[in-house]
Amino acid sequence: MARYTGPATRKSRRLGVDLVGGDQSFEKRPYPPGQHGRARIKESEYRQQLQEKQKARFSYGVMEKQFRRYYEEANRQPGKTGDNLLRILESRLDNVVYRAGLARTRRMARQLVSHGHFLVNGVKVDIPSYRVSQYDIIDVKEKSLNTLPFQIARETAGERPIPSWLQVVGERQRILVHQLPERAQIDVPLTEQLIVELYSK
């Protein structure tokens, strides 16, 4: 599946948000790339909407075509389209692995899933965009538990808060999906209504 593989820090600086998570280069230079950063200009409504969509896409590592499909699905569901969209993005397996603290970044989580390190309800899943459901159980494969990424995850457990809709159990690093998240449980610097306004034109 296609995905953005360019320089993440440069993209973070352009969009004004740390897309990597703990990106020290971004923290040192949180202004747009260029010799002195882009001059401050009054942003048009369209530009703000487009930038918010790009922030969401690159935060979750989703290409435009797939992101559009997510929006269309969210728009068909009952409730607020923006809330539905974020819930869909959060329910991706790579994001769940990241949120559970088993990977430092979503990009790393995507790699771990693609390399076949996880079972969902006892079945191997190696598709990062796989959508989890309430009451799913996600396990690290037995032979993967002692590999370096999961050793590091155990050593650094607790450094990043785990959202209340997930639970990580014991040394086996089993992930329990208690529910799909409500908007208040999603800690992401996005104004999703701007994305809805962009696509609804």
Curated annotation (Swiss-Prot):
One term under GO cellular component: small ribosomal subunit
Residue ranges occupied by any S4 RNA-binding domain in the UniProt entry: 91-157
Keyword flag Ribonucleoprotein: yes
Pfam families per the UniProt record, alphabetical: Ribosomal_S4, S4
Biological process (GO), any one: ribosomal small subunit biogenesis
InterPro entries (UniProt xref): Ribosomal_uS4, Ribosomal_uS4_bac-type, Ribosomal_uS4_CS, Ribosomal_uS4_N, S4_RNA-bd, S4_RNA-bd_sf
PROSITE patterns given in the database record: RIBOSOMAL_S4, S4
Residue segments, region Disordered: 1-42
Record carries keyword Secreted: no
GO molecular function: rRNA binding; structural constituent of ribosome
Alphabetic keyword roster: Ribonucleoprotein, Ribosomal protein, RNA-binding, rRNA-binding
SMART domains attached to this UniProt entry: Ribosomal_S4, S4
Subunit structure: Part of the 30S ribosomal subunit. Contacts protein S5. The interaction surface between S4 and S5 is involved in control of translational fidelity.
Family: Belongs to the universal ribosomal protein uS4 family.
Purpose: One of the primary rRNA binding proteins, it binds directly to 16S rRNA where it nucleates assembly of the body of the 30S subunit.
Protein known as: Small ribosomal subunit protein uS4
Organism: Mycolicibacterium smegmatis (strain ATCC 700084 / mc(2)155)
